[in-house]
Amino acid sequence: MKIKILFATLLTLFLFTTGYAQTLDKAKLDLFFERLAEKKKAMGSLTIAKDDKVVYTRAIGYAQVDATAKKPLTAASRFRIASITKTFTAVMILQLVEEGKLKLTDTLDKFFPQVPNARKITIRQILSHRSGIPNVRRDQATWKPGAPVTKDEMLALIVKGAPEFEPDTKNSYSNSGYFLLGLILEKLTGKSYDQALEERINSKIGLKDTYIATGHIDVNKGEALTYINTGSDWKQSFETHPSIGFQLISTPGDMAKFIQSLFDLKLISQDSVNQMKTMRDDEGLGMVTFTFAGKTFYGNTGGGDNYGSWLAYQPEEKLVVAYTTNAKVHPVKDIVTGVIDIYYGKPFEIPAFQTIAVSPEVLDQYVGVYSNPEAPKKWTITRDGGTLFVQPGSENAAALEATAQDKFQLFGGRLVFEFDAAKNQMILKRGGRSIVFTKEK
């Protein structure tokens, strides 16, 4: 009998210590985020939740930086979460399916017959990015990044675009498809997206800080402006008007509560959750998967205007990691990977972020506009003080890190720029590939 009791005790202890991180190393998490803040590699907010309880929060950096003051970020700071909005949209679409107001097999011509291939495109295909609807990008539109655009103008751009492929023959990410789903949601509910969100999600699970972005960022409402690293400080990034699509503002705390409630079946049925989780070409219905620390997580990511967001849920352990940033410098994925490795007690070395100084005289040799006839964008190189900046096309400029007198990197080394001033060339290296750009005169 004593042997059986001892065995049961040891088994219980084993199960406990191999599940939730035995002792969460909060000191190491603190050190990681302190290093990110000190080296100006990120500004943002993190929430880790386990079994419906928050076990760690941390915010670094600022919601607003101006000449007179800096407003620190807090756990309550609100961020644009970009494509994580799609997960909310997918949940509400699946609610309509469960209510019998919509079918995943319904075709788009039921709502927007003017869209090319509308009779062939199903709701399921739009949810899983298999519709072939072209992704309307900012540089295709006629408005300036900060100017508003109406829903009719967005719809006209989508209608004008040629299909990328026949429906369900491949996968291609489409913000435009989810814009149409937002319009369908409004048509079927007779309510605005924001009203539907409040009734169908927020009020059901107690979200207080999640809503549609309708105008420019308002720091007086706790919203965080977006910034780029100038090398010596933070410079406000340009801000795309949110009217180009349905875009949510939220906090890591609300995001964590949302995905936990989703998997707790407080929003949709198990069958609907299973459909969201079923991957085809790495896409589910408003959901993707990640592998961290050898475990499968479900969730989504978002990015735009130098905002970044990551929401990851491990269902067997009921673990949520929600991270938002208003200043992407160090890759968001690398930050989330570090957080999860630390959580599970995996080996993780906090980066030193060592760079070298290059004189302004040397940097000026690299300044200019670089192009390649086979590349879709030109790359503009500028200097501000002792920092070199790169701007692809009309996108935001980003500060480069010098690793040698003629070599610089971006996104933790994912992009490498090598300059040959004598030849007026810039070599862009990514993933084992190299492209030579020539400076324009």
Give the ranges of each region predicted by the language model.
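Short, glycine/proline-biased beta-turn/loop segments that scaffold the active-site neighborhood
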Residues: 104-118, 203-205
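Bacterial Sec-dependent N-terminal signal peptides
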Residues: 1-24
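Short, conserved catalytic-motif segment at the N-terminal edge
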Residues: 23-79, 101-106, 160
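Active-site SXXK
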Residues: 33, 46, 52, 60, ...
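Short, small/polar residue-rich loop motifs at catalytic or cofactor-binding pockets
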Residues: 40-43, 305-307, 375
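Peripheral terminal and inter-domain segments
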Residues: 18-19, 333-441
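Short, well-ordered beta-strand elements
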Residues: 299-300, 310-327
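Short, surface-exposed loop or secondary-structure junction motifs
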Residues: 119-311
